UniProtKB/Swiss-Prot annotation:
Main localization (coarse): cytoplasm
Entry keyword annotation includes Nuclease: yes
Pfam families (alphabetical): RNase_H
Chain's role: Endonuclease that specifically degrades the RNA of RNA-DNA hybrids.
Cofactor: Mg(2+)
UniProt binding sites for Mg(2+) 1: D13, E51, D73
GO CC terms of this entry: cytoplasm
UniProt-listed GO biological process terms: DNA replication, removal of RNA primer
Domain RNase H type-1: 4-145
Top-level taxon of origin: Bacteria
Protein name: Ribonuclease H
EC number: 3.1.26.4
Organism: Halorhodospira halophila (strain DSM 244 / SL1)
């Protein structure tokens, strides 16, 4: 999905019907005029796990290090990776209130993948008419639909 130079745009979203419940994740990748869509789901999960999984799947789809602009509607993902992660690691995967970090397995995988690329993390408000975010949301819901069909 990557070429020598340039920026890969990744638009990610997670969805859950019930929380916990069946969930899905969706990714729209764009490099220049090339687009690729990815999606999947899990029968019993949470919305936050699906948001993290979407970001992970986006970065896993890239076959070499590159610059990525990753756009999510999840403040949990954006703030987690840009603000909270270093503190969690310093505290042995504990929050500031000394509780275990939820979804540690996914945070560790996302941290590992993000270190391989140069990632700019962007946030957009969900369900606010952002075309690529709406597409990622539709893909996440497709992931759920195929599970429960």
């Amino acid at each position: 999905m990557t070429e020598q130079r340039g920026v890969v745009e990744a638009f990610t979203d997670g969805a859950c019907r019930g929380n916990p419940g069946p969930g899905g994740w969706g990714v729209l990748l764009r490099y220049g005029e090339h687009e690729r869509e990815l999606y999947g789901g899990e029968p019993e999960t949470t919305n936050n796990r699906m948001e993290l999984t979407a970001a992970i799947r986006a970065l896993e789809a890239l076959d070499r290090p590159c610059r990525v602009v990753l756009t999510t509607d999840s403040q949990y993902v954006r703030r987690g990776i840009t603000e909270w992660l270093e503190g969690w690691k310093r505290r042995g995967w504990r929050t500031a209130s000394r509780k275990p970090v939820l979804n540690q397995d996914l945070w560790q995988r996302l941290d590992e993948l993000a270190a391989y690329h140069q990632v700019d993390w962007h946030w957009v408000r969900g369900h606010a008419g952002h075309a690529e975010n709406e597409r990622a949301d539709a893909l996440a819901n497709q992931g759920i639909d195929e599970l429960v069909a």
